[in-house]
């Protein structure tokens, strides 16, 4: 009994000294950031902002409802409460090639990818129907380029679940986790 009381006391002291932090969120189930195109070829202009993108892939074995999925950079993530213009974010409400359910569900099939470009364009399906492209049409950042060439963090959030991929400049144009 004395040993148990001593262990409990030691645990309480450690908890008070070092604190306890529960994770703020869990990874987004079955979804992963698989690539970030962060550095457009040449100088950043409004004409090449679609060379910047984020790929979010369903790595699970079943379809995932991605309605409400938010793709954002670190600046947008840190300004969630005061980002009235929704700079540097895209919220999925539909996908090209996917029928939106009566309950507003947007089911991304297993193995399929959502590619979110920073610029403007027409949503489409490519790569044999497995890549669904969306566009932020960002008017924020430098000429609509939102991904930091020197490093940034890509975030995906779905409900209470969030995950991120941080990168640094590596003399390239795209990075993968």
Regions found by a protein language model. Give the residues of each.
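Activation on beta-sandwich/Ig-like modules and their edge loops
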Residues: 19-151, 157-177
């Amino acid at each position: 009994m004395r040993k148990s009381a001593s262990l409990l006391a030691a645990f309480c002291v450690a908890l008070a000294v070092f604190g306890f932090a529960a994770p703020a969120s869990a990874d987004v189930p079955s979804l992963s950031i698989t690539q970030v195109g962060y550095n457009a070829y040449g100088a950043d202009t409004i004409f090449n902002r679609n060379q910047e993108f984020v790929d979010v892939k369903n790595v699970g074995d079943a379809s995932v409802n991605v309605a409400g999925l938010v793709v954002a950079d670190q600046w947008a993530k840190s300004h969630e409460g005061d980002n009235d213009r929704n700079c540097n974010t895209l919220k999925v409400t539909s996908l090209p090639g996917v029928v939106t359910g009566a309950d507003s569900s947007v089911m991304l099939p297993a193995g399929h990818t959502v590619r979110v470009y920073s610029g403007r364009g027409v949503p489409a399906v490519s790569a044999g129907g497995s890549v669904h492209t969306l566009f932020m049409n960002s008017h924020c950042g430098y000429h609509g380029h939102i991904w930091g060439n020197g490093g940034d963090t890509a975030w995906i959030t779905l409900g209470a679940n969030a995950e991120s991929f941080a990168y640094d400049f590596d003399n390239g144009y795209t990075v993968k986790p």
